[in-house]
């Protein structure tokens, strides 16, 4: 990221220690606040919104953005952060996030290269009646097409623009089904169109906590 966000270190914010199921964020309370914020449920902000009469379009609460978040990809700094996020999302008080099947596509347990893909496809299924969050720190960010992915959260520092764009392109492939009603083999229902690739077009439209970019495959970053 750039500009006013240069001083914010995503890798430090999402720093975690411990292995796999024991992994925890070093700034767990702050990450929890962030999880509450992106769904518009952070209590101190509610008072502010009431006073100002405005409410930013938080990703997991805004009706315009929710359709893009049924199947999302969260790009984190490292394996420990991926497992720490999975552990935090699974905690009892995070009831909202229990609606989502969380897949950790990171570390040795996820396998090498494309070996990490089958668990993702299995969790997504047909994509209609499931919700998923794929956590990764690099796996499945190149050479992979999962048509149901429609958003990516950039939760790490990226020095290379190529890495940013390669990851962003993971959520820009089209998603359609043929013969959706079973009575017309020539009919095709488009559920997600291919994005234009203009990654910065909408960055100014949604400011604040979530900077949104892209068209049919939005990119969220702090």
Language model features with spans:
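Conserved strand-helix element at the start of the C-terminal RecA-like helicase core
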Residues: 62-90
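Short helix/loop capping segments that flank catalytic or ligand/cofactor-binding pockets
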Residues: 1, 83-84, 163
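Conserved RecA-like P-loop NTPase helicase motor core
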Residues: 97, 101-222
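Short loop/turn segments immediately following beta-strands, especially the blade-tip
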Residues: 92-95
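Interdomain helical connector at the RecA1-RecA2 junction of SF1/SF2 helicase-like NTPases
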Residues: 1-71
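Short alpha-helical segments and helix-capping/turn motifs at coil-helix boundaries
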Residues: 56-60, 86-87, 137-139
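"Short basic amphipathic alpha-helical interaction patches in structured regions
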Residues: 4-9, 75, 86-90, 117-121, ...
